[in-house]
Structures are given as structure tokens and as C-alpha cells.
Regions:
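N-terminal binding-site loop/beta-alpha segment at the start of enzyme catalytic domains
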Residues: 1-30, 80, 84, 154
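Generic structural signal for well-ordered alpha-helices
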Residues: 13-20, 47-54, 82-86, 107-108, ...
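A short, structured active-site edge motif that brings together acidic residues
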Residues: 27-41, 61-70
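Local beta-strand N-terminus motif with an aromatic residue
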Residues: 29, 59-62, 94, 118
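CE4/NodB-like, metal-dependent polysaccharide N-deacetylase domain
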Residues: 46-67, 87-91, 112
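Beta/alpha (TIM)-barrel catalytic core signal, keyed to glycine-rich beta->alpha loops juxtaposed to Asp/Glu
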Residues: 70-182
Length: 182
């Protein structure tokens, strides 16, 4: 399957859209996920953020649209932004909606104020940072945990090791199952 995870903040939506158009693949063969950045949180702002992303991607419908992160200093704007995602979902402009980087207390407050439970919460998860409590919370609410940096990220080094991929336990499991460490 082909899943492209992009975001307004990455500055690459236009390039992703061009790649999709030049790929020759049927749109149904590509799953596109993008994220609304915090400067587009609010009601109309979020709808405008969606329009900007859809235009850059060259798409009428986005498969998964999520909020890039909570805005704790103005959490009401985070909720308003998500309510705009709910509207886009109801209108068929997006197929699924979710959040990213929400921790348990964000989820608790958030779920009391929205109608649609997020399909996903994209969080940092890897062998050295499993966020078990948050993953249990996801399971309780039917939220899929989607990992970013699932192999340890580009800056996470534990105990002087170079990379999660060099971890002796990971290497041992890879050898045992005849797989690459990745």
C-alpha cells in the first residue's frame, strides 16, 4: 500500500501533489494524510488551512486530516479547529480525521468537547519511548495509535548508542527472524 504522510508545516505538499500526478497511479491506490498547523487553528482558519492543503496537493478529498499538535495556551482554538475537521468529514471533503501529539490530559479534555472520536493520534512511539499509558487510553476510546519516528527518530540516542537500529536486542531479534533491524 502507499501511504504518504505530509503536513502544511513540512512545506512539501505542493511537491507531494506533483509526485502523485506524475506517478501514473490511480488515486485510490494512494492514501494521503496531512496535518493542519497551529496558525490555522480556529473555525474559518482551519477550513482555509484545509483548502490551502487540498489545493497544493491537487486533491478534492484528503484521506486523513489531523491537527498537528494541541495548542495548550489556547485549547479552545484546538477544539474549534477539530470541529472544523468534523464539518469537513460530514461534507465528505475528508475520509477520516484525527490528532497528533496529544497526551492523556489533552485527550481527556478534548473528548468531552467534540462529537467525533479521532480516528488516530499520531505520536512519537519507538522501542525506547512506548507511551504505554497513552496507548491504553487510545484503546479505551477506539483511537488508533499512529507512530512517528517508530525506529527511534533522528535525534534519540540512549546510553551513547548510535541508533535504535544498532541496539543489541533489536539486532538479535532481526537475526532471529531473518529480518532487517528496520
Amino acid at each position: 500500500y502507499r501511504h504518504i504522510d505530509t503536513a502544511a508545516a513540512y512545506g512539501n505538499e505542493k511537491g507531494v501533489g506533483e509526485a502523485i500526478r506524475h506517478s501514473g497511479l490511480d488515486r485510490s491506490q494512494i492514501f494521503i494524510e496531512t496535518k493542519i498547523w497551529i496558525n490555522d487553528y480556529g473555525n474559518e482558519e482551519t477550513l482555509h488551512g484545509f483548502e490551502k492543503s487540498a489545493r497544493k496537493l491537487g486533491l478534492e478529498q484528503i484521506d486523513l486530516l489531523i491537527l498537528h499538535q494541541p495548542l495548550p495556551s489556547a485549547f479552545d482554538r484546538t477544539v474549534d479547529a477539530y470541529k472544523s475537521l468534523e464539518k469537513l468529514l460530514a461534507d465528505g471533503r475528508v475520509r477520516a480525521i484525527g490528532v497528533s501529539n496529544f497526551i492523556p490530559h489533552h485527550l481527556d479534555e478534548f473528548l468531552q468537547q467534540v462529537e467525533v472520536v479521532p480516528a488516530v493520534n499520531q505520536i512519537e512511539v519507538h522501542p525506547y519511548f512506548q507511551q504505554a499509558e497513552l496507548q491504553r487510553r487510545h484503546e479505551q476510546h477506539g483511537i488508533l495509535t499512529q507512530a512517528w519516528s517508530p525506529i527511534g527518530g533522528i535525534t534519540f540516542y540512549r546510553g551513547g548508542e548510535k541508533s535504535t537500529l544498532d541496539d543489541p536486542t533489536i539486532l538479535g531479534l532481526a537475526r532471529k527472524y531473518d529480518k532487517s533491524p528496520a
